[in-house]
Amino acid sequence: MELSITLIIIIITSLISLSAMGNHKMMDELIFYPPSVNRGQWYRFFSCGLIHADLAHLGFNMLSLYFFGIGTPTHLSEGPAYSGVEYMFMWVFGNQGKWIYLGMYILALLVALLPSYLKNRHNYHYRSLGASGAVSAVIFAGILFDPLSGIGFFFIPVFIAGFIYAILFLVISQWMERRGRDNINHSAHIFGALFGLAFTFFACRYIAGFNIFNYFLELIRNANPSDFIQFGSN
């Protein structure tokens, strides 16, 4: 497998995140901080996606990006070589697919944080970091392509269909955002996920002439209900 866009993102993000964890000055220069954005430092919308709070935060995001961005070999004679979104984009859009995928990832960093910025633009105590918004965009783009693929949780042998996971993810994230009792930017997860859906739909529709929403619904309509929840290895 050639070095993919996803792998390049993972390598760069991991190197910068690890460097920033031991360097407070570097962390302060890259973190999303609305008052600094107000002073013209718009790069923070993007640079904050290159840093993470700790190894668990970094590991979870990069593993999720790997599984949904690259996926596993499909062994198909026709179709994408791997099941991940980057390769699905190349299947739909041809050689420009990897660049459209990269564009989605970068734009998702911005779009996911816009609501947080508007809400906290004068809040001198607010900071945010991590690639979760962009990773959520990739995950939800993947669910559009394969709504029945089982999504599980670490060490729990239960897998639910992607489209059910998407609904639960949005509902729970919205509930936790309203509670506001943790230090997680659930808003970035929600808007990153919604952007991933919208970007993939419009790109497929207007660049490739492919109605992915009809494709998505057809897969669900033709599915066996037993595919929605599976126990054991997926």
Language-model-detected regions and their locations in the chain:
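A detector for small-residue-rich transmembrane helices and their helix-helix packing motifs
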Residues: 1-234
